[in-house]
């Protein structure tokens, strides 16, 4: 399989997002990279499904709560920016205060 660097990045985010999803299902609190991957993967999938940028900006704030991440993680992630592929092209999705 010959992937571009961008495709490799997406695969890495998706794989790390799956690990984070499984840990959440077991009740394990997520660390910084896991929380970033979990939210980023969900945003990428939402874009692929055809959701709008505005919908994803709101959706990104509903994915994780403070109780699901380690102490101090919400403060470490004031925003997340993901370059996602939508049906009409690539757009930047910014989620402010993603962990409520």
Curated annotation (Swiss-Prot):
<keyword id="KW-0963">Cytoplasm</keyword>
<dbReference type="InterPro" id="IPR002026">
    <property type="entry name" value="Urease_gamma/gamma-beta_su"/>
</dbReference>
<dbReference type="InterPro" id="IPR050069">
    <property type="entry name" value="Urease_subunit"/>
</dbReference>
<dbReference type="GO" id="GO:0016151">
    <property type="term" value="F:nickel cation binding"/>
</dbReference>
<dbReference type="Pfam" id="PF00547">
    <property type="entry name" value="Urease_gamma"/>
</dbReference>
<comment type="subunit">
    <text>Heterotrimer of UreA (gamma), UreB (beta) and UreC (alpha) subunits. Three heterotrimers associate to form the active enzyme.</text>
</comment>
<comment type="pathway">
    <text>Nitrogen metabolism; urea degradation; CO(2) and NH(3) from urea (urease route): step 1/1.</text>
</comment>
<keyword id="KW-0378">Hydrolase</keyword>
<dbReference type="InterPro" id="IPR012010">
    <property type="entry name" value="Urease_gamma"/>
</dbReference>
<comment type="similarity">
    <text>Belongs to the urease gamma subunit family.</text>
</comment>
<dbReference type="InterPro" id="IPR036463">
    <property type="entry name" value="Urease_gamma_sf"/>
</dbReference>
<protein>
    <recommendedName>
        <fullName>Urease subunit gamma</fullName>
        <ecNumber>3.5.1.5</ecNumber>
    </recommendedName>
</protein>
<dbReference type="GO" id="GO:0005737">
    <property type="term" value="C:cytoplasm"/>
</dbReference>
<dbReference type="GO" id="GO:0043419">
    <property type="term" value="P:urea catabolic process"/>
</dbReference>
<dbReference type="GO" id="GO:0009039">
    <property type="term" value="F:urease activity"/>
</dbReference>
């Amino acid at each position: 399989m010959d992937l571009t660097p961008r495709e490799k990045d997406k695969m890495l985010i998706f794989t790390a997002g799956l690990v984070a999803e499984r840990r959440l299902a077991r009740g394990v609190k997520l660390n910084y990279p896991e929380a970033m991957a979990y939210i980023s993967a969900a945003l990428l999938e939402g874009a692929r499904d055809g959701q709008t940028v505005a919908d994803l900006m709101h959706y990104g704030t509903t994915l994780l709560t403070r109780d699901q991440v380690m102490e101090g993680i919400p403060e470490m992630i004031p925003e997340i920016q993901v370059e996602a592929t939508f049906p009409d092209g690539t757009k930047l999705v910014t989620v402010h205060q993603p962990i409520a």
